[in-house]
Design a protein with these regions (language model features):
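Conserved beta-alpha structural segments and adjacent helices that either
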Residues: 1-576, 594-595, 599-619
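Charged, low-complexity
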Residues: 580-639
Length: 640
């Protein structure tokens, strides 16, 4: 359909007081599908924040649904929005951190965040701010419990109100919470007499509910480390810790759907037996459609919301669809080869849990969409808006040159930007990195600077002042009258980033993939053994992936893959190394001798350190400017 032309007098952008980026001023009311061209990498947070403000608050409904290509881009965009758009409420829906058709469940921390977001969308709390929902291709393409289910499963309690503690504990058990002796992590609960401790999804700290009979006398926040009270609450709401609840009705529905899908269950069918008994089963979320009569997607939760697609979405979608299909085929082929007496894995058809390519196309065709691209597109197209941004200056050539000082080059560039009346931000990954960079550049004539915690504070910058901000950007960018110079533009790539959670199950797979059949390994308790391969065995009525290790005399040890940290690779490639005997004393004796030797070495080191402290020598102070430059080039994150 031909997009409508905006009325006369409506330009591509309109000026907005206090913002460097001109807002989109109702342009999208006349265009269903729009592509924003020349949006440089790193500027997405600024652009999306402005789009959200243009959409405005929608009485609790999302202003934008942003689909990122992967979890890393979603994390970076979330951090960028926190800086560029602190006035926007951000909800994130991450994808499961496990493989399609896996035997493990998603990480509870990931599930808690997903459930918190879905609950907020099903029962809106924030109505005054624009709401941006961030998600990924993997998460957007996966079916979810319905909005009605999420709204019904939200539990509320108030100080002075009445509640049946026994019924509440039953609700926690059915909704994925784990009973522990001491509550420390999200999704845990503990009871002691008339006290219920609970760490609910979406909460920063756990809470303690004091019961007197069926009355909740008080609700207190407490520190999970010290267990000391830190504050009081009048009211508390929490949501399930799992997308699968195990109420009697749900168990009955699962049994009915399972039998109609796969036929009669056998004694070896551990999934069916566990759910029938009301027990949670590792990886049961991969059969989510069997627990529900109906499922929805994030597109249903964000019905009528403009969808923003990042530049790599199309490629990520193709890869995801192929990945799901490959895992399904592998499981189906393995099912045909399942030996009698082993636990079968009966995979569901992909379309039951994941959107098909046709469904994706239909969803996007029916929605109002905005695509972002860093590339220039023909400006005669009515569906293209040119943001006229570009990537920031790279100083790679200056870093490589022996006769050029990269910091002098950076100062020269900053001077050119100020001379052009640009608003300039200098961004670094951490406070320490920003301090070092500022100090070095000041030695080269940086001029006046001001620390800013978020983008609105940039309006306080006086003429010629440079803003200093902690903002994790891979590279800087220029957009309208704003120029952001990133730490990496000047110093090059840093070698360590903030820690990222690996997909559950991928850590051990990566390690196992590095082992070949016949490799020697050392178990911390049992000594040298030989790796045979991976084997799935029955443990506590459920299948478990284990590493098969053989020891002297042919004795075998099956080590669960999640305990692979107990193994190290043997330091020599010699294949004739003597294997230890399971239960023998030789390995323990060798460890004892080694510990004794380590203590002797430690004693020598302590004596050497003491002697060094007693000696004196002239103190040399490095030239301040050169030393600061050396520190600024340090490519690693400093430890605490």
């Amino acid at each position: 359909m031909e997009p409508k032309k905006p009325p006369a007098g409506v330009s591509s952008f309109a000026k907005s007081e206090g913002l460097p980026l001109k807002k989109f001023a109702g342009l999208f009311k006349y265009r269903t599908h729009v592509t924003l061209s020349r949006v440089p990498d790193g500027a997405e947070g600024l652009v999306i924040g402005d789009l959200a403000r243009d959409a405005g608050p929608r009485d609790g409904r999302p202003s934008l649904l942003v689909v990122c290509s992967d979890g890393l881009r979603m994390q970076r965009l979330e951090a960028a929005l926190a800086f560029f758009a602190p006035d926007v409420h951000v909800l994130a829906l991450p994808s499961w951190d496990c493989r399609p058709y896996d035997r493990v469940s998603p990480n509870p921390v990931v599930v808690a965040r997903r459930m918190t977001t879905l609950s907020h969308l099903a029962s809106p709390r924030e109505r005054r701010k624009p709401i941006v929902v961030l998600t990924t291709v993997n998460a957007a393409g996966q079916r979810l419990p319905t909005r009605a289910t999420m709204a019904a499963e939200t539990f509320a309690a108030a100080a002075g109100g009445r509640a049946d503690m026994k019924a509440l504990v039953g609700w926690l058990e059915a909704n994925g919470f784990e009973r522990t002796s001491t509550v420390r992590d999200t999704g845990e609960y503990a009871t002691r007499g008339g006290i219920l401790d609970l760490f609910a999804p979406g909460s920063e700290t756990p809470v303690r509910l004091d019961f007197f009979g069926d009355e909740i006398e008080q609700i207190r926040r407490f520190d999970p480390e010290t267990q000391r009270t830190t504050g009081q609450l009048k009211r508390l709401e929490w949501v399930p810790m799992s997308e699968v609840t195990l109420t009697p009705d749900v168990v009955s529905r699962f049994r009915r759907n399972y039998l109609s899908t796969f036929g009669a269950a056998t004694r070896e069918d551990a999934l069916y037996q566990a759910i029938s008994d009301g027990r949670r089963y590792a990886g049961m979320e991969h059969w989510l459609p069997l627990f529900h009569d109906k499922l929805e997607t994030i597109f249903d939760y964000c019905e009528g919301t403009r969808i923003v697609l990042d530049p790599q979405v199309d490629d990520a979608l193709k890869e995801r669809l192929a990945d799901v299909a490959d895992h399904f085929e592998a499981r189906r082929d393995a099912l045909d080869d399942t030996a009698p007496g082993t636990v079968p894995y009966k995979p569901l058809e992909p379309k039951l849990l994941h959107l098909t390519a046709e469904e994706w196309a239909s969803r996007l065709a029916d929605a109002v969409t905005t695509r972002l691209t860093p590339f220039a597109l023909p400006d005669d197209r009515l569906d293209v808006v040119d943001c006229e941004g570009r990537q920031g200056r790279s100083f790679a050539a200056e870093r490589a040159a022996t006769d050029v000082n990269v910091f002098d080059a950076a100062i020269s560039h900053l001077g050119e930007l100020r001379a052009a009346s640009r608003r300039v931000l200098l961004a670094a990954w951490s406070e320490g990195a920003l301090d070092r960079l500022k100090q070095v550049l000041e030695d080269h004539g940086l001029g006046r600077t001001r620390r800013i915690a978020s983008w609105p504070e940039a309006g306080l910058l006086e003429k010629g002042e440079i803003g200093l901000a902690v903002l994790g950007l891979e590279q800087g960018f220029e957009l309208e009258d704003l120029a952001v110079v990133a730490e990496q533009d000047i110093l090059g790539d840093r070698l360590i980033r903030a820690k990222k959670r690996k997909p559950k199950g991928s850590a051990f797979l990566t390690e196992v993939a590095g082992l070949a059949e016949g490799d020697l390994v050392v178990h911390v308790d049992h000594g040298i053994g030989r790796f045979i391969g991976l084997k799935t065995i029955q443990a506590a009525g459920a299948p478990h992936d284990c590493l098969e290790l053989v020891y002297q005399g042919g004795d075998k040890l099956y080590l669960p893959v999640e305990n692979i940290e107990l193994l190290t690779r043997y330091g020599s490639d010699e294949s004739d190394a003597q294997l230890d005997k399971l239960g023998g004393v030789a390995w323990g004796a060798r460890k004892a001798r080694m510990k004794k030797r380590i203590r002797e070495i430690a004693d020598q080191l302590i004596k050497t350190a003491a002697a060094r402290l007693l000696r004196t020598a002239p103190r040399y102070t490095p030239p301040e400017g050169l030393y600061d430059e050396f520190r600024a080039r340090f490519p690693y994150e400093e430890t605490d």
